[in-house]
């Protein structure tokens, strides 16, 4: 299987990242290497550190960037971004990009269990070396834990019914077994309950929201003044987290009764007045970009 490295919102990423030819940049989610490729084209004396917890992405990108000496590929979850950079003597960077979507190769890989459209083993691990899988969650978590995961991470209204049916039908081994249960309670609503359940499981397996929140905080101390952080999300939970994080760090929140200091600066300045979405032309060219939402901010 080859990587599909068509980057989402390529022009917008370059616009808001504002790549300097001699800058130090971080691609926190290497994936198919599309955004890394865009950044590298702008670098002359600069350098790029690209992270991915999926070893397949790292191995394939080694081939893609085999002759490029301006990039280092790091097999690691972005949660360890600051630690890994500091180990390399890097304490400040000129920009960071996150593309939080599943890569095409992960969706298409029949052994990963990310897609509800094909019958696969319930895995859903980004990092194949970690122990926790969707299979373990489905077959071992309590009713309460399953219900809460489906409701909180999938925003599924019928989370209780689906969780109860899973407990009743255990053991479940494949994606289609789970799809059959989830869609049983769809009740003619638009869209698939399966999509919500699979999203919820993937978030739980990979601790996506928890690690994203912690990593965004790390980025504040890594960014130089005037440097950008760009985040592309693909569902409302991620987008809300990023939106709230940017807002919280872009407002002045001084204690009451203290004198106002005229030169007080916020940590971030939001540079996307509203969320940026792909054009109709991009969606027609790259269908998987359709739910992408980009937000960007600059370090003050």
UniProtKB/Swiss-Prot annotation:
Domain of life, source organism: Bacteria
Protein's GO biological process: rRNA base methylation
List of residues binding S-adenosyl-L-methionine: 33-35, 52, 99, 106
Keywords: Cytoplasm, Methyltransferase, rRNA processing, S-adenosyl-L-methionine, Transferase
Catalytic reaction list: cytidine(1402) in 16S rRNA + S-adenosyl-L-methionine = N(4)-methylcytidine(1402) in 16S rRNA + S-adenosyl-L-homocysteine + H(+)
First and last residue of the signal peptide: none
Broad EC category: transferase
Chief location of this protein within or outside the cell: cytoplasm
UniProt-recorded Gene Ontology molecular function terms: rRNA (cytosine-N4-)-methyltransferase activity
Annotated InterPro entries: RsmH, SAM-dep_MeTrfase_MraW_recog, SAM-dependent_MTases_sf
Record EC number: 2.1.1.199
One cellular component (GO) term of this entry: cytoplasm
Subcellular location: Cytoplasm
The UniProt record lists the keyword NAD: no
Its job: Specifically methylates the N4 position of cytidine in position 1402 (C1402) of 16S rRNA.
Family: Belongs to the methyltransferase superfamily. RsmH family.
Protein name: Ribosomal RNA small subunit methyltransferase H
Species for this entry: Phytoplasma mali (strain AT)
């Amino acid at each position: 299987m080859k990587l599909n490295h068509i980057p989402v919102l390529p022009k917008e990423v370059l616009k808001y990242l504002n790549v300097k030819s001699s800058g130090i940049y971080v691609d926190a989610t290497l994936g198919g290497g599309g955004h890394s490729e865009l950044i590298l084209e702008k670098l002359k004396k600069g350098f790029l550190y690209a992270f991915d917890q999926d070893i397949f992405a790292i191995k394939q990108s080694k081939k893609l960037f085999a002759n490029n000496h301006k990039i280092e590929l790091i097999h690691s979850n972005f949660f360890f971004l600051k630690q890994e950079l500091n180990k390399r003597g890097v304490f400040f960077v000129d920009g960071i990009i996150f593309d939080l979507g599943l890569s095409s190769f992960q969706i298409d890989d029949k052994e990963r269990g990310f897609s509800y459209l094909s019958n696969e083993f319930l895995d859903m691990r980004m990092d194949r070396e970690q122990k926790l899988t969707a299979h373990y969650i489905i077959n071992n978590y309590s009713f309460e834990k399953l219900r809460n995961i489906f409701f909180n991470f999938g925003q599924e209204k019928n989370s209780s019914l689906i969780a109860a049916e899973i407990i009743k039908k255990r053991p479940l081994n494949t994606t289609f077994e789970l799809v059959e249960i989830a869609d049983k309670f769809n009740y003619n609503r638009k869209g698939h309950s399966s999509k919500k359940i699979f999203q919820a499981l993937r978030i739980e397996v990979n601790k996506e929201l928890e690690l994203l929140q912690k990593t965004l905080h790390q980025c504040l101390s890594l960014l130089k003044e005037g440097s950008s952080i760009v985040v592309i999300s693909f569902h409302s939970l991620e987008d809300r987290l990023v939106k709230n994080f940017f807002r919280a760090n872009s407002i002045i929140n001084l204690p009451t009764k203290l004198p106002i200091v005229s030169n007080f600066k916020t940590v971030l300045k939001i540079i996307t007045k509203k969320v940026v979405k792909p054009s109709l032309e991009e969606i027609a060219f790259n269908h998987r970009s359709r739910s992408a939402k980009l937000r960007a901010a600059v370090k003050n």
